[in-house]
């Protein structure tokens, strides 16, 4: 028999009647029966179905039936996604608007409930109940109220957003609506601070984008190759990035940046400058929160370069502020380690180079930036000349000038200026600590080039914004990365630089201002300097050698060219022919590939149609399964009614049913109703037991009063009973004595009768003892024989064992005596060798002493001869000096 279905107009009218009498569940069931009909969506237009759909969604929102709303929305989409997209969009927007309004109303209700509780008693603001609740659950009244009132509606709104996104993700006609709902979901997460839902929403959107990229050939599917789709996805990811930054979910922000970069790389046209500026700004913020100052400065530099090139109306103040931001971010980058490859030993998944390369791709850089390259780019873009004088001086002091004694004082003045104008320079305040660390490292490097050692006290005077613990940590980090040779002497409270002249860990490449190399570096470069000097000397001694070699080489090259020119000419012609053939081959391959691509496209289209047909069949099967489930539900409802009718015939059943309304009964099944009946029966039993206990208490009081009245009567009864018991005991005792006397007489007679048996007993015992004694003597003889044999055997064994022990002791003593004699011989031989060595040493010393004395005598003789020669020279000099004067005087005469 066919199922009876109402027309949509009649169903809507009947649903309104159910709503008026306060039965929204019955109204929703009525509308749902219409949607389950297989023929309604092919018979009626959207003008008839749309009002019914709005009422259907209104009831779903009122009753928080998100799964039922999802079923109706999917049915409505299948009908009107190709016929009237505007109707589908209006229905979805209306559904979400109703859910948002109810959620906002629940939020206002929750706040109002808390306000009423707070204003209930002004004298007792903190009640004992509120104190206990806050101590137990750690929540205040607002949190508890939100969990009770607001949270169900928040959950319903979140499910509604997810259902709508899942509904529209593959429909190219509703693509704009899909992205609008995604932005609405981001606003929902921001408004209610739902971080977990935000992460799930990001994963869902990322999964949808991956599905679009994998399959884009469906009839109504979304194609990522269209520029409009790419722009919508890009705008949604930018909105996602802003929301993630506002919620401080930096991991999701980084994933959004990767998605944005992928979409921009996929797009054939260049993104607009405003989008790129927003991208670089958010990227710099994410890098800053991640503590990656190098890429943070690189992103700011890209933003500065883009703004300067494309924004023509940029004022001088804005340009100066941006330049100062870029310059300070670049100068605050920590000085690089000499061996960054050491970091790979503590990495868990990827090497630092791979991570840096991946981040460089996000910035559009061919290779990862470095501090030196960024400073070089800053100078190339003339950034130091665009900033104010104080920041220009900051650059010169850190990167150009060499003045370690005044470096920190100068930097401190810049830091004080930034801190004093913190309201104006809010962007520069986060760089103060990094700037101080870079300054201290610069100070240590410059001090190491001037001093070999310095005291901690003096170094702390030069670095006023650093304490001894921070300074020692920086020194240890410098040594750990092999940047410098530093030795800390805590006993002297001093620091020594470059004291190991035989060791240099790396080639010295000065980064920043430098005066001279370290002593260890000077020792290391001696061979290089020697090679340079020798090369120059050779060029001076043989100035024409290099010219002759070049002329000879040129002659050889010309001769070689004439030998191979014909062969090379033929090879070039052959290569041109190969290139032409290769072009023809590639063209044929391209044509074949295009044909194959067209054929593959047709196959994919056919498969897409088959998949769509299969999906429709699955939906049809799902509807049939849902209908079957509804029939089962109807059977359950029928059994429920029968159970309710059966229970209503009992007194406790009527009492239980009177506590439930019609809606509450519908929510229960037969088992739950039976359980409720059992609970009601148990409750009645407990009430009966309490009544019985109260009656028992009354009876107890009455019984106690009766006992008090019975006490005198019991005392009289006990006195009479004692007299009767005494008489009974006396008669019983007399009877017992008489019986004992008679029993003794019988025992004496029995003893006299048994004494006649004593001789027979003694005779039997003597015979038994003789028999046992002979047996004992026989066993004793056997034991003594066995004992004697065992004693002889053990004596023989002991003699053999002792003889062997004496033999082994003799052998050990003999061996020890031999070893002792060998040791004595060895010691004697060693003593003789030592004596001989001592004698040889004395002989060598005597010979050395003799040679020394001969050498001293020879040296004395030589000195005496030199002295005499010198005296002769002096005497001759004096004579030569006297003779001219004498000759001159004689000539004058």
Swiss-Prot record:
GO terms for molecular function: mRNA binding; translation initiation factor activity. GO terms for cellular component: eukaryotic 43S preinitiation complex; eukaryotic 48S preinitiation complex; eukaryotic translation initiation factor 3 complex; eukaryotic translation initiation factor 3 complex, eIF3e; eukaryotic translation initiation factor 3 complex, eIF3m; multi-eIF complex. Residues 319-502 form the PCI domain. It holds the Pfam family eIF3a_PCI_TPR-like. Transmembrane segments: none annotated. Residues 576-707, 784-881 form a coiled coil. Residues 837-881 have a biased composition (Basic and acidic residues). One of its GO terms (biological process) is formation of cytoplasmic translation initiation complex. The keyword Transmembrane does not apply. Component of the eukaryotic translation initiation factor 3 (eIF-3) complex. The eIF-3 complex interacts with pix. This is Eukaryotic translation initiation factor 3 subunit A.
């Amino acid at each position: 028999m066919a199922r009876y279905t109402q027309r949509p107009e009649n169903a809507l009218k009947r649903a309104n009647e159910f709503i008026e009498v306060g039965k929204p569940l019955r109204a929703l069931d009525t509308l749902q029966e219409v949607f389950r009909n297989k023929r309604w969506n092919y018979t009626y237009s959207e003008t008839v179905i749309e009002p019914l759909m709005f009422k259907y969604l209104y009831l779903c929102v009122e009753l928080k039936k998100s799964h039922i709303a999802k079923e109706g929305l999917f049915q409505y989409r299948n009908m009107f996604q190709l016929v009237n997209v505007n109707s589908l969009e209006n229905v979805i927007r209306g559904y979400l608007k109703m859910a948002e309004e109810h959620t906002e109303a629940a939020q206002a209700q929750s706040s109002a409930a808390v306000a009423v509780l707070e204003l209930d008693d002004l004298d007792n603001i903190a009640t004992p109940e509120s104190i206990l609740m806050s101590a137990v659950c750690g929540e205040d009244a607002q949190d508890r109220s939100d969990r009770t009132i607001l949270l169900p509606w928040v959950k319903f709104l979140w499910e509604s957003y997810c259902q709508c996104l899942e509904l529209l993700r593959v429909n190219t006609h509703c693509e704009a609506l899909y992205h609008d709902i995604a932005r609405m979901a981001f606003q929902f997460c921001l408004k209610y601070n739902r971080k977990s839902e935000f992460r799930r929403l990001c994963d869902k959107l990322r999964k949808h984008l991956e599905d679009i990229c994998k399959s884009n050939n469906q009839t109504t599917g979304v194609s990522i190759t269209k520029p409009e789709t790419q722009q919508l996805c890009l705008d949604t990811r930018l909105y996602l990035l802003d929301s993630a930054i506002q919620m401080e979910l930096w991991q999701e922000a980084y994933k959004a940046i990767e998605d944005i970069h992928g979409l921009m790389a996929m797009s054939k046209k260049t993104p607009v400058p405003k989008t790129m500026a927003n991208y670089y700004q958010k990227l710099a913020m994410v890098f800053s929160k991640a503590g990656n100052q190098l890429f943070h400065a690189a992103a700011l530099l890209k933003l500065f370069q883009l703004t300067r090139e494309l924004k023509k109306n940029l004022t001088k103040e804005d340009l100066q502020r941006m330049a100062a931001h870029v310059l300070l971010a670049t100068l605050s980058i920590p000085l690089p380690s000499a061996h960054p490859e050491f970091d790979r030993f503590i990495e868990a998944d990827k090497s630092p180079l791979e991570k840096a390369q991946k981040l460089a791709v996000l910035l559009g850089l061919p290779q990862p930036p470095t501090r030196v390259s960024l400073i070089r780019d800053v100078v190339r873009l003339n950034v130091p000349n665009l900033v104010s004088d104080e920041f220009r001086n900051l650059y010169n002091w850190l990167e150009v000038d060499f003045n370690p004694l005044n470096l920190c004082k100068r930097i401190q003045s810049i830091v004080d200026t930034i801190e004093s104008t913190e309201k104006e320079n809010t962007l520069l305040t986060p760089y103060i600590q990094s700037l101080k660390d870079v300054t201290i490292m610069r100070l240590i490097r410059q001090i190491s080039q001037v001093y070999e050692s310095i005291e901690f006290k003096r170094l702390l005077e030069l670095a006023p914004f650093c304490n001894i613990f921070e300074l020692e940590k920086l020194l240890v980090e410098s040594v750990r990365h092999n940047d410098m040779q530093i030795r800390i002497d805590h006993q002297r409270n001093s620091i020594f630089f470059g004291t190991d002249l035989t060791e240099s860990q790396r080639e010295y490449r000065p980064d920043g201002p430098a005066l001279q190399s370290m002593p260890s570096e000077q020792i290391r470069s001696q061979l290089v300097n020697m090679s340079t000097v020798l090369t120059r000397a050779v060029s001076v001694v043989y100035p024409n050698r290099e010219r002759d070699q070049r002329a000879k080489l040129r002659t050889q090259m010309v001769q070689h060219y004439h030998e191979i020119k014909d062969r090379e000419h033929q090879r070039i012609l052959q290569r041109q022919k190969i290139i032409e053939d290769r072009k023809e081959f590639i063209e044929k391959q391209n044509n074949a590939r295009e044909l194959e691509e067209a054929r593959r496209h047709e196959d994919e289209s056919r498969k897409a149609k088959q998949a769509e047909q299969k999906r429709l069949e699955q939906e049809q099967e799902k509807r049939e399964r849902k209908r079957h489930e509804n029939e089962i539900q109807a059977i359950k409802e029928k059994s429920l009614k029968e159970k309710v009718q059966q229970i209503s015939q009992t007194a406790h059943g009527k009492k239980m049913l009177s506590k439930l309304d019609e809606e509450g009964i519908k929510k229960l099944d037969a088992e739950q109703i039976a359980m409720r009946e059992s609970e009601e029966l148990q409750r009645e039993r407990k009430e009966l037991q309490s009544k019985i206990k109260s009656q028992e208490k009354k009876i107890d009081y009455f019984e106690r009063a009766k006992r008090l009245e019975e006490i005198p009567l019991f005392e009289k009864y006990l006195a009479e009973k004692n007299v009767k018991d005494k008489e009974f005991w006396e008669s019983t005792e007399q009877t017992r004595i008489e019986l004992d006397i008679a029993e003794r007489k019988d025992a004496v007679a029995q003893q006299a009768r048994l004494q006649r048996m004593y001789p027979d007993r003694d005779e039997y015992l003597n015979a038994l003892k003789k028999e046992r004694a002979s047996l004992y003597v026989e066993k004793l003889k056997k034991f003594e024989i066995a004992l004697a044999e065992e004693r002889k055997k053990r004596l023989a064994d002991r003699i053999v064992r002792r003889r062997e022990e004496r033999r082994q002791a003799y052998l050990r003593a003999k061996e020890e005596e031999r070893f002792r004699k060998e040791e004595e011989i060895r010691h004697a031989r060693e003593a003789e060798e030592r004596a001989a060595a001592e004698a040889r040493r004395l002989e060598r010393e005597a010979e050395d002493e003799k040679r020394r004395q001969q050498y001293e005598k020879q040296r004395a003789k030589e000195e005496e001869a030199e002295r005499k020669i010198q005296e002769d020279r002096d005497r001759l000099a004096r004579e030569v000096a006297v003779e001219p004067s004498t000759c001159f005087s004689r000539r004058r005469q």
